A protein has these predicted regions:
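Transmembrane alpha-helical segments and their short flanking loops
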Residues: 85-193
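Loop-to-transmembrane-helix entry motif
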Residues: 1, 34, 71-79, 154, ...
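Helix-loop-helix junctions within the multi-pass membrane cores of secondary transporters/permeases
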Residues: 36-116, 184-191
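Helix-loop junctions at the membrane interface of multi-pass solute transporters
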Residues: 16-17, 50-60, 171-177
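The feature identifies polytopic integral membrane transport proteins across all domains of life
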Residues: 22-38, 62-70, 142-149
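Transmembrane helical segments that form the transport core of multi-pass membrane transport proteins
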Residues: 14, 18, 22-23
Length: 193
């Protein structure tokens, strides 16, 4: 969890610098989304609450919220990825007595970043999508995969909360980008078919 909070601090700091707006103003609205994510362990199930929290911020453009939050809920799984990288190293040390080599870890991290984009926003989605990587790249046996699933499930709620809360920072960056490039706000009306 400490890693999650450090990552969120870096992410919101970078978003504040890039956009020229306060990331703390965005972050202060994310309490309900964070708690919902902890309870559901699902970015998809937390989406409605996250949208509501993001719309409360004065620093986020409404059109960027409507575009960014649903997109990032599906492709931005930083908390899950951070946790999984830490856990593969821990499980490797515990079961096999050594950490994975630098080469396999670099390859694993690169591929995990790609796999995480396609992982479903459901409980355990990231680790389930990456089991092939864990066994194929890091050469974990069945006992290593089983331990990864068990340990990951115990903390998945906090990874999901980091994912959802980080979406606010990315949307702040998106707002900053739109303003720097003079992209005007679009008001989309409901269309009846």
């Amino acid at each position: 969890m400490v890693g999650h909070y450090l990552w969120l601090a870096i992410l919101y700091g970078a978003a504040s610098i890039y956009s020229g707006r306060s990331g703390l103003e965005v972050l202060r609205h994310y309490g309900p989304a964070y708690l919902t994510a902890v309870g559901t362990m699902s970015s998809a199930a937390t989406l409605a609450v996250a949208l509501d929290c993001a719309h409360q911020s004065k620093n986020l453009r409404s059109d960027m919220v409507d575009f960014g939050i649903p997109l990032f809920a599906n492709i931005h799984l930083c908390g899950s990825v951070l946790t999984e990288v830490f856990f593969v190293m821990t499980v490797s040390q515990v079961l096999y007595g050594t950490l994975p080599g630098v080469g396999p870890m670099v390859l694993f991290c690169l591929l995990l970043g790609i796999f995480a984009i396609g992982a479903p926003g459901v409980p355990g989605g990231t680790v389930m999508a990456s089991l092939g990587l864990i066994s194929g790249v890091l050469l974990f046996g069945d006992e290593g995969l089983a331990l990864m699933l068990a340990v990951f499930a115990l903390q998945d709620s906090f990874g999901t909360a980091c994912n959802v809360t980080g979406d606010g920072a990315l949307t702040l960056m998106l707002t900053g980008y739109a303003e720097k490039h003079h992209i005007r706000a679009e008001n989309v009306q409901n269309v009846e078919l």
